[in-house]
A protein has these predicted regions:
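Generic structural signal for secondary-structure transition and capping sites
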Residues: 116-119, 312
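ATP-grasp fold ATP-binding core
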Residues: 119-126
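Helix-start/capping segments and mature chain N-termini
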Residues: 15-109, 127, 132-327
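Phosphate/pyrophosphate-binding loops at sites that engage ATP/ADP/AMP, CoA/4′-phosphopantetheine
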Residues: 110-115
């Protein structure tokens, strides 16, 4: 049976004849946080009448963690504080006051209770939890849950093929794109499925002005003449935490950085193209439409190696980006 799901959605491994990149084959962590308590994952269930299921009035985050390669008694989370801050800000769009400190406390306790032994991913989610109908964000209850799953490489580290999507990235004047609002990901899902059913791994979306915006759930970078170039916030992109990390690393490594509009044709003549995201990490792009891109990727590999060293707590210069949790 052929199955493809959108970014971050789950499939069951038994139904797949082979691994398809960009889907997650899930081994869920046994304990989840749901309705203000820690419960077995299989007991965390929502009513079919939950408001957020009908109107997309939820927001989510996602962060990676690994067992510490240098210390078997702790696990490492990458940029935990930034992820919690972003989700707290996203919750404000839902008229929900959820402090970042509360989110962080729950995530830390969740990791301690699960004691993961392999690379993993944490998904916190805030949502309107009332039962019933009528789209609104006032006079309504809110809640949040957190769960985790083991997750290795989400996209092929050797590189992915991308289709230029017929779907366009939404505009900030229509949706709060600085929050990871669940309802907004219908466009990502349409673009992803269009790409995969056409024989590609990923989708690249333009904005309403025809400029490059982002992939289905990742930011995009190109390299031209030694400069690292990426669309700016005015191109209706998500304020990616991995994106921010890459820009900081590049500047500190002496790589010229430019944030500006990127034309579609620039993707085809760039020296290097890569995607970035919490799940995707840094993933090279090897093909766009029927154009094969260069496999010589010195800046992509330099940044990926640097980011890997930081996430594994092997780079003391960026130790404040890594949150260690004893288990």
């Amino acid at each position: 049976m052929k199955v493809d799901r959108g970014w971050g959605n789950c499939v069951i491994m038994a139904f797949l004849p082979e691994r398809r990149w960009g889907t997650a084959m899930h081994n869920f962590l046994p304990i989840a946080y749901f309705e203000n308590q820690f419960v077995p994952f299989e007991e965390a269930k929502l009513s079919i009448a939950t408001h957020a299921l009908h109107y997309g009035t939820g927001a989510f985050g996602g962060l990676r963690g690994i067992p510490d390669p240098q210390n078997p008694h702790q696990v490492l989370l990458f940029r935990l504080d930034r992820h919690c801050d972003r989700l707290s800000n996203s919750a404000r769009f839902l008229n929900y006051d959820l402090p970042a400190s509360k989110i962080q406390s729950v995530i830390v306790d969740l990791v301690k209770k699960n004691q993961p032994t392999a690379s993993f991913y944490i998904r916190p989610f805030v949502y309107t939890s009332d039962l019933g109908i009528a789209p609104r964000l006032h006079n309504i209850e809110h809640n949040f849950f957190v769960y985790g799953l083991e997750l290795g490489d989400y996209l092929s580290p050797e590189g992915v093929s991308c289709r230029l999507s017929s779907w366009y990235r939404q505009e900030d004047r229509s949706l709060p794109l600085r929050g990871k609002i669940s309802g907004a990901y219908i466009t990502s899902s349409l673009a992803k499925t269009e790409a995969v059913t056409s024989g590609f791994d990923e989708a690249i979306l333009m904005n309403s002005q025809g400029k490059v915006s982002e992939a289905s759930g990742m930011n995009i970078f190109i390299v031209r003449q030694g400069k690292l170039i990426t669309p700016g916030f005015e191109q209706d992109i998500l304020e990616g935490i991995t994106r921010d990390s890459i820009l900081t690393l590049a500047r500190n490594l002496g790589i010229p950085v430019v944030e500006r509009p990127v034309d579609k044709t620039e993707l085809l003549i760039a020296d290097e193209v890569f995607l970035s995201g919490t799940a995707a990490k840094i993933t090279p792009v090897r093909q766009i439409e029927n154009y094969q891109l260069s496999t010589n990727r010195p800046i992509t590999h330099q940044l990926r190696d640097k980011l890997s060293a930081i996430t594994e707590n092997r780079d003391p210069e960026y130790s404040d980006w890594v949150f260690a949790i004893p288990v």
